[in-house]
Amino acid sequence: MEAVPRMPMIWLDLKEAGDFHFQPAVKKFVLKNYGENPEAYNEELKKLELLRQNAVRVPRDFEGCSVLRKYLGQLHYLQSRVPMGSGQEAAVPVTWTEIFSGKSVAHEDIKYEQACILYNLGALHSMLGAMDKRVSEEGMKVSCTHFQCAAGAFAYLREHFPQAYSVDMSRQILTLNVNLMLGQAQECLLEKSMLDNRKSFLVARISAQVVDYYKEACRALENPDTASLLGRIQKDWKKLVQMKIYYFAAVAHLHMGKQAEEQQKFGERVAYFQSALDKLNEAIKLAKGQPDTVQDALRFTMDVIGGKYNSAKKDNDFIYHEAVPALDTLQPVKGAPLVKPLPVNPTDPAVTGPDIFAKLVPMAAHEASSLYSEEKAKLLREMMAKIEDKNEVLDQFMDSMQLDPETVDNLDAYSHIPPQLMEKCAALSVRPDTVRNLVQSMQVLSGVFTDVEASLKDIRDLLEEDELLEQKFQEAVGQAGAISITSKAELAEVRREWAKYMEVHEKASFTNSELHRAMNLHVGNLRLLSGPLDQVRAALPTPALSPEDKAVLQNLKRILAKVQEMRDQRVSLEQQLRELIQKDDITASLVTTDHSEMKKLFEEQLKKYDQLKVYLEQNLAAQDRVLCALTEANVQYAAVRRVLSDLDQKWNSTLQTLVASYEAYEDLMKKSQEGRDFYADLESKVAALLERTQSTCQAREAARQQLLDRELKKKPPPRPTAPKPLLPRREESEAVEAGDPPEELRSLPPDMVAGPRLPDTFLGSATPLHFPPSPFPSSTGPGPHYLSGPLPPGTYSGPTQLIQPRAPGPHAMPVAPGPALYPAPAYTPELGLVPRSSPQHGVVSSPYVGVGPAPPVAGLPSAPPPQFSGPELAMAVRPATTTVDSIQAPIPSHTAPRPNPTPAPPPPCFPVPPPQPLPTPYTYPAGAKQPIPAQHHFSSGIPAGFPAPRIGPQPQPHPQPHPSQAFGPQPPQQPLPLQHPHLFPPQAPGLLPPQSPYPYAPQPGVLGQPPPPLHTQLYPGPAQDPLPAHSGALPFPSPGPPQPPHPPLAYGPAPSTRPMGPQAAPLTIRGPSSAGQSTPSPHLVPSPAPSPGPGPVPPRPPAAEPPPCLRRGAAAADLLSSSPESQHGGTQSPGGGQPLLQPTKVDAAEGRRPQALRLIERDPYEHPERLRQLQQELEAFRGQLGDVGALDTVWRELQDAQEHDARGRSIAIARCYSLKNRHQDVMPYDSNRVVLRSGKDDYINASCVEGLSPYCPPLVATQAPLPGTAADFWLMVHEQKVSVIVMLVSEAEMEKQKVARYFPTERGQPMVHGALSLALSSVRSTETHVERVLSLQFRDQSLKRSLVHLHFPTWPELGLPDSPSNLLRFIQEVHAHYLHQRPLHTPIIVHCSSGVGRTGAFALLYAAVQEVEAGNGIPELPQLVRRMRQQRKHMLQEKLHLRFCYEAVVRHVEQVLQRHGVPPPCKPLASASISQKNHLPQDSQDLVLGGDVPISSIQATIAKLSIRPPGGLESPVASLPGPAEPPGLPPASLPESTPIPSSSPPPLSSPLPEAPQPKEEPPVPEAPSSGPPSSSLELLASLTPEAFSLDSSLRGKQRMSKHNFLQAHNGQGLRATRPSDDPLSLLDPLWTLNKT
C-alpha cells in the first residue's frame, strides 16, 4: 500500500483587506498620554505601515507565513501601548472582505485586524500543505506540519477571539477548519507510516484516527447553519470527506486483516478483508465525479484488497477451515491521534522581530518592573545571608587551624637549593680561589705573628739572661763592679719598649685568636659553598617522612584543596546569581502582559533562579562534612607538622649560617689584611728592638767581663768548683726545637701550637713525654694536646732521648677510676746517630715500633706496656736520586737501618679493673700531616720476646669537632696492615686486616710523597696457622676534613733485591663514592675481613684545594709506563725506590659531570600493593587518554608554557651560525648547548637534556648532521665520549637525500670527517632496528674507540611508527647497550632530522618507561615535556606525538602487568616479546689498551665488572650491579674457592704450615650471549678472580688454585715460553726499561 496514489487535500482561500488608518490616532495618543513629540515616531509608523502592506498582499510561500506572524506580533505590541480596541480612545475602523459572500465588513477594533491576519495565516498554511505532492518523505513531513500549523491558527482564533467578527470566522466554521486540517495532517502521517512499513496494527489505528477526524468534519458540514454559510462548496467538501471516511476505514480493516494473518487467526483475517472490500466498494460509489487521482487510488486499493480477500478466503476454505466471525463480534479499531494543532505565540521575539515601538513604555510597565526588581532583591538577600553565615564559620575554622595550603606541603622546597644560596654558590664558583686566599692570608698573618712572638721571646730571654749574669756578677764581684749608669738606663729603656710591645702583642693576640676562630667557623662553609652543588644540597637538612606520614600529608592537602574548591565554587555561584539578577529585565514582557497576570508572570520568571539556588544550597550543606574531614586529617597531621616545623627551623638556620659565612668572607679578608699590616709594622719595630737589645746586652757583657777580669787579678785563684748546671726553661727548648709548624697549622692561634717536648726524667709511673699518649684517657700523665708539629726536615743535634712527634689522641673521655698496679717502666738508653737529610732525601727515620700500648684482650687484666726509650735511628742516605725515563718523578733511595735495640721484656701484669667498654683504635689518630719517609728495608735483626697482638678492627670513638680546630672529625682508624710481613706475622686467627674507606689523598705541599711506612708491631708470631699478611695502599686521615678522593693510587711495597720473606701483592683500595661517603660497590668480591660496625656518617667534606697536578691526558697517554714491574712483581731498577704516580687533574667540565645513572636493583613489582597501585594508575591514565578535550587542553598549556619559558632563555650564539642550523626555528639555548672544545668554532646544534629521570641516562638532542656539520657531529661524539648513538630517521628521508649518510655503510671503506676517521666493524639487522658497531680514531693516534649506532628506520618524517611495541622494544635495546658501557654518566646522542620532533617523543618515552620499570608509577608526561622543552625548544613538536606517547605508555604498563601475571582489561595488543640478549658491544673506552682513561678509572671499572653471574640467569639484568654484599659477612661465609686477592704465597725458602686445600666447586655454566664475539668488556670481565681464564673454553687445561701457587716450580721466570693463547703474552714486562 505504500505505492498507492495520493488523495487530494482541501485548502482555504485568503481574506482580502480594506483600509486601516492607524497613524493619526497613534500620533494623537502619543502626544496626549506620553507627552512626546509624535513626529519622533514617524519612522516606526512607516515601518508598521510597510509591514501591513506586505501582510495583506502576502506571497503564497513559507515567507508569507513569516510576514503574517511578524505583523501579528507588532499589532500585539502596538495594542499594549496604544489602546485601539473596541470603544477605546485610539480606536479606528478596520475593513476586511468576508470570503463566502464577498461583502466588506468593518469594525473599530484592532482585534478584528489581528483575527483576520490569524485566519489568513491558517488559510495560507492549508494552501502550502495541499500544494505538495507528498511523494517523498520530506514532502509528507512538510505537508503534515503545514496542516498542523493551520489547525493551530484556527484554534487560537476560536479560543482568543470569541466575538464573531464575520461569518467565515464563526465558531462552527473554525471548528470545521480545525478538524479538516487535523484529518489531513493525520492522513499525511498515515502515508508516511505505510511508506515506512510500520506494524499493521499501528497503521490500522492511524487510519482509524483519520476516519474519526473526517467524521467530525462531516458532522460540521451536515449542520444546516454551516451548510447555509458555506453555500456551493459545502457539497463538494461533503462528498470528498465521506468518500475518504469509507476509504480510510477500508484501509484500517485491511491492516487489521494483516494483523490477524500475522497472528494466524485466519477466520478473523477473512472477516476483516471482507469488511475492507465492502467499505472500499462504498467509497467507489461516492467517488463518482472525483478527479482522476482519486479514481487511481481507489483502483489501486481495490487490487490490493481484492487480491488479499480472495487469497485469504481460498486458504481458509481449503486449508484452515476456521469459522469466519461477524464483524460486530471483532474488536473495534481505536484511533491513535498523532497530530495536534501547533500553538501560535504572537509575541515570540524569534518570530516578531524587534519591537517597533520599544521606546514607548507605559507607566504601568515601569511599576510592574519595580515590583519584580524587589522580588529579585528579596531572593538575593536571602541567599547572601546564608552564604555569609557559612563563610564566617569557615573563616573562623581555618584561622584556628592555621593551615595555609601553600605551605602545608612544601617538601619540594627542600629538594633543591634555594635561590639566595645558589647566588652565593655562583659567586664563589667564579672565584675559585676564595678559600685558598683566605687561608693563605691567615697563614701569612700567623707567620708574621709567630715571628713577632719569637722575636719578643728572644728579647725576653736576652733580658733574663742579662739579669742572671748580672746577679752572678754581683755575687762574684759585689757592688764594687757596678756597670755604668748609661748602660743601665739603656737597658731600662729596652725593658720599657719590650713591655710596651709585649702588651700590644698580647692584645693583638686576642684579636688574632678571635679572627682565627671566626675563620675556622666560616672556612668550612665557604669550602662547602665553593664545592659541587650536590654536596651543598646534601649539607642542607632533608625531611625524613615515612610513607604513612606522606599519606597523611597528601590526605590533608586533598582536603584543603576541597575546601578551596568549595570556596571558589561558592564565589562563582554567587557571582553568577548576581549577574543573572542584574541582567534580568522583563519590561518588554510586562508591556504586553495583562495586569491581572503579573503575579503569575513573576513566579514564572523567578523559576529561572531555582537551579542556581539548588547548587548554592548543596555547596553550603557540604561545608559541614568537609570541615569534619579536615578536623580528622589535622589530628593525624599533628606529628608530621611538628617534624616539618623542626625541619623548617633547621633549614633556615643552616641557610642563614651559610649565607652569613659568605657575607663574612670580605670582612675576614679585610680584617686579615689589617692584621697583616699591623704585624708587619710591629715586626719591623720588634726586630729593631731585638738588634738594640742584643747590642746592649753584648756591651754589658763585655763591660762585666772587663770588670771581672780586673777583679780576678786582684783576688787569689779559688778552689775549682763545678757551677750549678743551668736548667733551661722548657718553653725555650720547645721554641728552639719546634721550628716552623707545617703549612696547614700556621693558620692556628699560637696558643694551640706546641712543638714536641723533651721528656722529663722518669718519675714514678708518669708517662714519658716522648711516648705517644694512651689511646684512652688516664688519670696520670699529661693531658692530650690538640696538635703537635713534627720535627722539621733539618739537621738536629738532639738529646740522647728519642724524640718522637706527639700524635693527638682522641678527646678526653671519662674512665671509671680504680686502683691500678703498674710496674715501674724500664728502658735502655743508647746513644743515637744524628740523621741528616737533603732536599731530595727526607730523614729516613725508624721510630721504635710497638711503643704504644697493646690493646687489652677482653676479659684479661691489662697494664701499660713496657716503655722503651732510645735514640732515633737514622739511615745512611744515598747521595744520588735515580730516575727512569718512563717515570717523571725522583726515586728516593736509602740503605737499611741498623738493628733496633732490644726492648725490655714486659713486666708481670697485676689485675686491674677493666676500663669502660669504649674500645679505642690501636693505631694513633694522625692529627697533623706527618712527613712521609720512603719505604724501609729492614735487616734481619729481629727483636724477640713480644707476643703478637690480636689485631682486629676497633671502633673509633665518635669525635666531636672542636671550635678552635681547623679540621673535621677524624675517620675511624683501622689496624695498620703489615709493611714487612716476613718479619712479624701477626697472630690474627680468622681475621684479615680490613680496608679503610678513605684512600690516602696527597695534600698541598707534599706532592709526590709516598705513603708513610706501614709499621706494625715487631713481634714474632707464635706457632699458629697464620694467614699470609698483605700490604697495600693504606688510607691515612688528612689533617683537615676528609678530602674528596683523587683517583686512588696503587702503592705497592718495593721489594728488596733479595726478598727475605713473603712479598705482599699490591692492593688497590677503592675510594669513597662520589656522594662523599663510603658506599660498597655492587657485586664485589666478598671482603677478606668483616667490616667494622657502623659509626656515625662523617659530615660531607668541603672541597679541598687541588694540588698541582698533571693534566689528565698526560697521565692517560702513558698508562703502562706506571711501573708494571712494581704492580706485577717484576724486578726493579737498582734505585730501589718506588716510582710515584702523579695524581691526574680532572677538567672543570669533567668535574661538573652529572651523577651516574641510578640502576634498578631488583624488580619493584614483587609486592602486590605496587601492582595494585600500578593498575589504578593505568585506569586513571587510560581515562586521560580517552578524553580528547583533556589532551587538547594539556597541549595548549604546554605550548603556552613553552612560549613563557623561551622568553627567559637566550639563543644568541646559535643565531650567529645560521648555516649550521637545519631549521632556523630549532636552535639550542646558550645555557645548555654542547660546546665543542677542539673545533674551529665551538658551535653545534645540540642540547644537553638531563634530569628527566634518575633512571634515564643524560641525552644529547641534536639535528641530523648537514653535509657541512658531519665533522662537528663526530667531534662531539669524540669529546663527549659517547658510546651509543640513536638515529630516528626513515630510509625514505635518506633516499631522498633530506638527511645525509654521515656514517660508513661498507666494511673496509673508512670514512674521514676532519680529524676523525670512522670504520664499520659489524652490521646486524633486527625486525625493529639496524645495529652498527663503528670504530672511531682521532688523527694519528693508534687507539680506537668503539661505539654502537642504533638506527630505527620505521618512523616516517610526518607520521608515527607502525606500533608502540616496536618503539618500546627499541628503547629497551638502547638501554641494554647503554648499560654495557662504563662509566654510566656519559650521554646518549639522539637525533632525527630536526632534533626535536621524533627526538622529543623518544626522550619522553625513554624516561617514562624507566620510571615505570623503577616502580615509581606512571609519571606526569606534561611535566616531563615541559622539562625537556626548558632545555631545548619545540621538543615533542606535534600533538600527534604526545598522544602516541600516551598510548605507548599504556602499552608498556600493560606489558609490565602481564609480565607479573595480571591479565589486561581488554583484548591485548600483539605482545612484543622483548628480546633479552646479552649484547656486549665494544666499550667506548677501551679499558685494556688504555684509551683516554686514567688508571684509577680502569681500576674502578675492573672492580665494577667483577661480578659472578648467577647460574642459569639469562636476562641482561644479570650483568647489572645489584645490591652489595652485607658488610657484616663473617669469614666463614666466604666461598672457599675464591682466592683472597690480597694474599701472597710464602717464599720458597720459608717453610710454612700447609694451607687447607680448597674444595673444588662445579664450574658455573655461562649464560649464552648473542653479542659480538669479543670485546674489551668481556676481557675485563674475565679478569675478575671468579671468572679469570685465558680462554673461555679452558681447552682442557687444569684450573689454577691456591695450592698451585704454594708449590715450587722450576721455570725460567720471565724467559719461559709463553702460551700462544695468552692475550697479554706479547707484552715485555721490562719494556719501560728497554724503551731507550
Curated annotation (Swiss-Prot):
Sequence repeats lie at residues 953-954, 955-956, 957-958, 959-960, 961-962, 963-964. Residues 898-922, 950-962, 983-1002, 1036-1050, 1083-1109, 1523-1533, 1542-1556 have a biased composition (Pro residues). It catalyses: O-phospho-L-tyrosyl-[protein] + H2O = L-tyrosyl-[protein] + phosphate. InterPro entries: ALIX_V_dom, BRO1_dom, BRO1_sf, Prot-tyrosine_phosphatase-like, PTP_cat, Tyr_Pase_AS, Tyr_Pase_cat, Tyr_Pase_dom. Residues 1192-1452 form the Tyrosine-protein phosphatase domain. GO terms for cellular component: centriolar satellite; ciliary basal body; cytoplasm; cytosol; early endosome; endosome; extracellular exosome; intracellular membrane-bounded organelle. The active site is at residue 1392. TPR repeats lie at residues 250-283, 374-407. Changing residue 302 to V: In NEDBASS; uncertain significance. The modification Phosphoserine is found at residues 733, 1122-1123. Residues 701-714 have a biased composition (Basic and acidic residues). Changing residue 894 to Y: In NEDBASS; uncertain significance. CDD domains: BRO1_HD-PTP_like, PTP-N23, V_HD-PTP_like. It comes from the Eukaryota. Its EC number is 3.1.3.48. Residues 1567-1587 have a biased composition (Low complexity). GO terms for biological process: cilium assembly; early endosome to late endosome transport; endocytic recycling; negative regulation of epithelial cell migration; positive regulation of adherens junction organization; positive regulation of early endosome to late endosome transport; positive regulation of homophilic cell adhesion; positive regulation of Wnt protein secretion. Residues 8-394 form the BRO1 domain. Disulfide bonds: none annotated. Residues 953-964 are annotated as: 6 X 2 AA approximate tandem repeats of P-Q. It holds the Pfam family ALIX_LYPXL_bnd. It is linked to Neurodevelopmental disorder and structural brain anomalies with or without seizures and spasticity: An autosomal recessive disorder characterized by global developmental delay, brain abnormalities, mainly ventriculomegaly and/or brain atrophy, intellectual disability, absent speech, peripheral spasticity, and microcephaly. Additional variable features include early-onset seizures, optic atrophy, and dysmorphic facial features. Early death may occur. Belongs to the protein-tyrosine phosphatase family. Non-receptor class subfamily. Plays a role in sorting of endocytic ubiquitinated cargos into multivesicular bodies (MVBs) via its interaction with the ESCRT-I complex (endosomal sorting complex required for transport I), and possibly also other ESCRT complexes. May act as a negative regulator of Ras-mediated mitogenic activity. Plays a role in ciliogenesis. Interacts with GRAP2 and GRB2. Interacts with UBAP1. Interacts with CHMP4B. This is Tyrosine-protein phosphatase non-receptor type 23. The lineage of its organism: Eukaryota, Metazoa, Chordata, Craniata, Vertebrata. The gene is PTPN23.
